Curated annotation (Swiss-Prot):
Superkingdom to which the source organism belongs: Bacteria
Disulfide bonds: none
Name of the protein: Small ribosomal subunit protein bS16
NCBIfam families, sorted: S16
Organism expressing this protein natively: Thermosynechococcus vestitus (strain NIES-2133 / IAM M-273 / BP-1)
Cellular component aspect of the GO annotation: cytoplasm; small ribosomal subunit
HAMAP family: Ribosomal_bS16 (MF_00385)
Alphabetical list of Pfam families matching this protein: Ribosomal_S16 (PF00886)
MF term (GO), any: structural constituent of ribosome
Length: 83
């Protein structure tokens, strides 16, 4: 199963994340199938590749809870998609 999840980058206590499509059995920082965006929680910056995200969601990829919240804020998913 393909998951849309966060992959950690950055320094200690100064993390940034890339939003990636990965197999759900792969390690968090393992090899990604595709990079779909960027998230910096410290500066509250989000960059998304909307077409690629929509394509992955149409293929049946499941976002994690944190990624789902980012997509709802960016209006890529409806509010009811949140748990």
């Amino acid at each position: 199963m393909i998951k849309l999840r966060l992959k950690r980058y950055g320094k200690k206590r100064n993390a940034t994340y890339r939003i990636v499509a990965m197999n759900n059995t792969d390690r968090r920082d393992g090899r990604a199938l595709e990079e779909l965006g960027f998230y910096d929680p410290i500066h509250n910056e989000v960059r998304l590749k909307e077409e690629a995200i929509k394509r992955r969601l149409a293929q049946g990829a499941q976002p994690t809870d944190t990624v789902r919240r980012l997509f709802v804020k960016a209006n890529l998913l409806p509010e009811t998609a949140q748990k």
